[in-house]
Amino acid sequence: MDRIVVKGSGPLSGQIPIAGAKNTCLKLMCAALLSDEPLTLTNVPRLSDVATLSELLESLGVQIGRLDDGQTLAFSANTLTSQLAHYDIVRKLRASFNVLGPLLGRTGQAVVSLPGGCAIGARAVDFHITGLEAMGAKIELKDGYVHAAGDLKGAEIEFPFPSVGATENVMCAAVRAKGTTVIKNAAREPDTKALADCLIAMGADIEGAGTETMIVRGVDRLHGATHRVIADRIEMGTYMCAPGIAGGEVECLGGTRALVASLCDKMEAAGLEITETDAGLKVRHPGGRLKAVDVATAPFPGFPTDLQAQFMAMMCFADGTSVLEETIFENRFMHAPELIRMGASIDVQGNTARVTGVDRLRGAPVMATDLRASVSLILAGLAADGETTVNRVYHLDRGYEHLVRKLRGVGANVERLSDG
């Protein structure tokens, strides 16, 4: 099994190119099911999650062409041979559940396994189901599968919480439904807006994407399109935290402040300098110790839950005590015990973690528990004394393209080793 070894390496310097957004790309791939004409995606990140979803789409009859070393994918769903998304694939990747809306919208039926992915809480799919039921779908949960069927009609749907996955599943179903669907308390994430932009390019009639209220007018068919995947704001935010921990100056290429504004605000409050450039965002550590800053995760435009672990690693080196509140998922502080093994002072009570900065961390063998936890341990190792070995790094392959290469490119002492 692979592991990543990190040694404290001093200040970082250089540029890191940001890949296409994983979460956006996966939902765009599902949207290919809505049309019998090809959908071509560019700036595709080369990740194991993309490969897993490709496997699922191919099992449904989608043909996939791969160009530019996998950075361009062409999907042809002219003839779907199945409406069954099997457990063996869906269990590996939660985003696989988002074939439900497109399959139901196009074919009127779908059988989709309940999802898998990172082990970070229950992450129920209730909102997906109630939203589709409001549009007329008949849904039955049986033997771990969602059985859905029916001719969909426009409806007014208000989510109790702005769920990203539910908003996207309902939106994809609504573009092929009869009549108009109004989605209230919709997710405002850039990934959701990017999906709407792609659907519009395919001929969908959508208003209000990126706001709390979306209006989707159903159309008879969607045509093909070519669409570029936006920059990954979580990858970008991850690498922005690197100089906050190790010191130095790093420019993240390909994104904008608007994608990570909430993170920028907190990093500047901690004392880091952030400059928007023509190519991306530059983060500079001015020297000395950062100031402790409190964070509460929230739906976009709030602080992303997917950057909470990385920010915690940075606060381990800050002056004072920061309070991190996780409001999106339960059980998402699994990285805290591993940081404590490295000498961090962290007290977790329920959905709140109090992080008191320490003078230094010490390298130690640690275990990654999920995608974002794994990268937070690597970041912490950049400024720890000695050597940090992060085990179970297969999680990283789900969300970070060439992480070791990118960190080494700005001066980090990090390598990936295999037991063979």
Swiss-Prot record:
Q: Which Pfam families match?
A: EPSP_synthase
Q: Where does phosphoenolpyruvate bind?
A: K22, N23
Q: Which UniProt keywords apply?
A: Cell cycle, Cell division, Cell shape, Cell wall biogenesis/degradation, Cytoplasm, Peptidoglycan synthesis, Pyruvate, Transferase
One Gene Ontology term from the biological process aspect of the record: UDP-N-acetylgalactosamine biosynthetic process
List the EC numbers from the record: 2.5.1.7
Positions of post-translational 2-(S-cysteinyl)pyruvic acid O-phosphothioketal modification: C118
Identify the domain of life: Bacteria
Where is this chain primarily localised?
cytoplasm
What Gene Ontology terms describe where this protein resides (cellular component)?
Answer: cytoplasm
Question: Which PANTHER family does the UniProt record give?
Answer: UDP-N-ACETYLGLUCOSAMINE 1-CARBOXYVINYLTRANSFERASE
Q: What name is this protein filed under? A: UDP-N-acetylglucosamine 1-carboxyvinyltransferase
Instruction: Give the source species.
Output: Jannaschia sp. (strain CCS1)
Q: What is the lineage of its organism?
A: Bacteria, Pseudomonadati, Pseudomonadota, Alphaproteobacteria, Rhodobacterales
